Amino acid sequence: VSGSGIMAKRVVVDA
């Protein structure tokens, strides 16, 4: 997982 991918998943998990 790279920057963009981890960021997108992070947002979903955080939300």
Curated annotation (Swiss-Prot):
**Alphabetized UniProt keyword annotations:** Ribonucleoprotein, Ribosomal protein
Q: Does the keyword Ribosomal protein apply?
A: yes
Its GO CC terms? ribonucleoprotein complex; ribosome
What family name appears in the similarity comment? Belongs to the universal ribosomal protein uL13 family.
Descriptive protein name: Large ribosomal subunit protein uL13
